[in-house]
């Protein structure tokens, strides 16, 4: 058995060193950078759980506007290892990131040379772009790895002298990697284009190689297309298949309609991505920061030119050129370019081109020295950008929710706590919160503080986020006059405010308030046209509480003004609601209509500040259904309200004490619009 040479051993240890540095960059402040989880990660994690718990295996998952399935499969494996946890979400991205670096080191080292492979792999190991992506649990992580598998397979199949049987094995493996790539991320179509361009380059520059290996190349193409067919079919036949793209493709649709301004702007933004422009969103970048903030970025353009020059001699390089051009099309055609996430296929090519620019220098010792300088400069600037500038930005904390982690930590320290938590997203934040492992004995309900306040007839803690602060109509519930005591606040990981905490003792104040509210009657009237005159003259008063389908009851209404202006005004109405069921996933909403006397709706407000999945029997919530009237002709208008299923439009019936249906909406009162 032939022993490896000393040179090979040195390169092996260098590769190990690069991987160790990469692992450190991805594990340092693990769980704290990003500061918390974001909603896109939760969608994938939920599907990974469902894959294991319910056997819900899919090629394409329709949730969150639709996405490919391969990363969900990896999350399923992670769930079997770590359960419902942050580690479950982060682990696949970490492993895929290290594999990408290892494969880049090997593949680029063989297709170009070891020195270039080492520089490129090291840049992937420490660059902001790669480190960032590998620290979030999103499917884009997987595409560069599969792209490098395909590059390596095509190289070994057409350039390395191996036995025929091994060539066929490599061809099958490469075709499988090509086909499976379509299940990683939307940008994967560019990998198929790149393989086609590689074949064209062989036709133009190395026909002998093409004649020798056309059968293996045919296998790669055919197998890749066969494996990809189900996903292509889903994309073309399922409305969800293109839903994600259709929500962000304004530059394309505008160009098709004759206005190419945004498309041209996107082109220049993408062209300047290495040095001049950057992703404008804090979600995935220090907003507007280019990939490289030093002259290192200029090396990309030189390296791109070197790659073009080398295509005739090394057609395999055209794959990387395609990654850096065709791979940018998803960002070119969509909003917020340059999007670092949608451009992810270009990542290995960008790092390769920086290394290629250095490698043209004849003295390879200088190349090595400059490579080290480039790596160190990139590491220092990108480390500061990620772990300092980006991590301390308020917008980042609003996306990556470490404030919810503070709530979970607080709940673990309390004895069977009852928490009422304000949040901006009452659907997704509870799912995210579950992965932060709150205690099983905690009773926690989320509500939208921007429209609603949740109260309890039992001792409870009210937690108010600055992102979802209580509005003036409900602010008195935070005062000592209504029995509320402010406690020490919860802080984010950077020391900023996460949640204000209040001890509620609202039983007496709530009873007094309801007694006051219930002096205003509400009415039943089932005709479509409304008579003139006072409501109590033509509608039948009904008693509180008003039972909506044995699901929820209206226990009070506050309508402080019955006269509004015809301009820049609206109907200020507060609804007091009490659930009759607990934590059921019902698609409910509450409407308030401002109608003309002929029944035509002039304006309306639909909202439910506490989803039914968050309801408990001890809870009562008050929501501000302020109806923005807009320009309003002078006259009388009727205010009505009801509750409906927003999926099928059916209204909940109003039941009398015997359970009989008496209406499907309430008349609250009439208001008068008066010209200034």
Residue ranges of model-derived segments:
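Short, solvent-exposed loop/linker segments at the N-terminal edge
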Residues: 562-568
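Membrane-integral, polyisoprenol-dependent glycosyltransferases
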Residues: 2-258, 262-364
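Short glycine/proline/serine/threonine-rich loop/turn segments at secondary-structure transition edges
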Residues: 631-639
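A beta-strand/beta-hairpin structural motif
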Residues: 602-632, 657
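Membrane-proximal, lumen/periplasm-facing interface regions of secretory-pathway glyco-
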Residues: 290, 296, 367-447, 533-543, ...
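Aromatic/acidic, Gly/Pro-rich catalytic loop(s) in extracytoplasmic/lumenal soluble domains
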Residues: 450-556, 651, 656-676
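Short acidic/polar inter-strand loop motif in beta-rich domains
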Residues: 633, 643-654
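Short periplasmic/luminal acceptor-recognition loop of GT-C membrane glycosyltransferases, typified by
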Residues: 411-440, 465-467, 572-597, 609, ...
């Amino acid at each position: 058995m032939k022993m490896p040479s000393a040179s090979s051993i040195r390169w092996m240890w260098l590769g190990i060193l690069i991987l160790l540095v990469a692992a450190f960059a991805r594990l340092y402040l693990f769980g704290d950078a990003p500061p918390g989880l974001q909603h896109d990660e939760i969608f994938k994690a939920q599907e990974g759980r469902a894959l294991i718990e319910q056997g819900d295996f899919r090629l394409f998952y329709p949730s969150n506007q639709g996405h490919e399935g391969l990363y969900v499969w990896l999350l399923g494996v992670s769930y079997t290892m770590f359960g419902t946890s942050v580690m479950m979400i982060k682990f696949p991205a970490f492993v895929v990131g290290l594999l990408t670096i290892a494969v880049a080191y090997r593949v680029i080292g063989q297709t170009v040379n070891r020195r270039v492979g080492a520089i490129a792999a090291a840049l992937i190991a420490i660059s902001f772009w790669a480190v960032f992506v590998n620290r979030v649990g999103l499917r884009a992580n997987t595409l560069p790895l599969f792209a490098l598998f395909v590059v390596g397979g095509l190289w070994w199949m057409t350039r390395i002298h191996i036995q025929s049987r091994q060539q066929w094995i490599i061809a099958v493996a490469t075709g499988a990697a090509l086909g499976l790539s379509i299940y990683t991320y939307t940008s994967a179509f560019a990998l198929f284009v790149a393989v086609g361009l590689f074949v064209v380059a062989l036709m133009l520059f190395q026909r002998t190689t093409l004649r020798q290996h056309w059968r293996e190349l045919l296998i790669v193409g055919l197998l890749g297309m066969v494996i990809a067919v189900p996903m292509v079919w889903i994309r073309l036949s399922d409305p969800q298949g293109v839903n994600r793209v259709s929500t962000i493709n304004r530059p394309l649709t505008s160009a098709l309609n004759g206005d190419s301004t945004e498309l041209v702007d996107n082109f220049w933004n993408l062209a300047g991505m290495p040095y001049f422009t950057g992703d404008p969103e804090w979600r995935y970048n220090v907003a507007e920061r280019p990939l490289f903030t030093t002259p290192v970025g200029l090396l990309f353009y030189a390296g791109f030119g070197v790659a073009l020059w080398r295509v005739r001699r090394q057609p395999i390089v055209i794959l990387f050129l395609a990654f850096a051009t065709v791979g940018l099309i998803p960002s070119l055609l969509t909003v917020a370019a340059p999007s670092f996430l949608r451009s992810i296929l270009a990542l290995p090519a960008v790092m390769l081109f920086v290394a290629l620019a250095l490698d043209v220098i004849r003295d390879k010792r200088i190349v090595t020295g400059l490579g080290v300088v480039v790596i160190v400069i990139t590491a220092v600037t990108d480390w500061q950008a990620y772990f300092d500038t980006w991590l301390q930005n308020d917008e980042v904390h609003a996306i990556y929710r470490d404030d919810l982690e503070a709530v979970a930590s607080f709940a673990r320290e309390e004895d069977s706590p009852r928490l009422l938590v304000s949040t901006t997203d009452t659907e997704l934040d509870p799912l995210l919160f579950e992965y932060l492992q709150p205690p099983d004995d905690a009773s926690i309900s989320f509500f939208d503080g921007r429209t609603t306040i949740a109260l309890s007839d039992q001792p409870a803690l009210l937690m108010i986020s600055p992102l979802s602060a209580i509005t003036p109509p409900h602010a008195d519930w935070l005062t000592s006059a209504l029995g509320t005591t402010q406690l020490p606040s919860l802080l984010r990981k950077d020391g900023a405010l996460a949640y204000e905490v209040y001890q509620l003792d609202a039983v007496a104040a709530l009873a007094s308030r309801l007694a006051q509210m219930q002096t205003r009657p509400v009415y039943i009237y089932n005709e479509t046209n409304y008579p003139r005159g006072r409501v109590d003259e033509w509608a039948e008063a009904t008693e509180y509480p008003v039972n909506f389908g044995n699901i929820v009851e209206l226990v009070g209404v506050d309508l402080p003004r019955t006269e509004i202006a015809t301009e820049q005004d609206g109907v200020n109405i507060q609804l007091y609601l009490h659930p009759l069921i607990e934590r059921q996933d019902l698609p409910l909403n509450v409407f308030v209509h401002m109608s003309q006397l002929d029944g035509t709706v002039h304006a309306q407000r639909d909202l439910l500040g506490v989803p039914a999945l968050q309801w408990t029997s001890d809870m009562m919530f008050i929501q501000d259904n302020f109806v923005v009237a807009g320009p309003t002709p002078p006259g009388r208008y009727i205010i009505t309200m009801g509750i409906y299923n927003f999926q099928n439009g059916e209204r909940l019936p109003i039941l009398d004490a015997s359970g009989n249906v008496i209406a499907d909406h309430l008349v609250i009162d009439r208001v008068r619009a008066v010209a200034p």
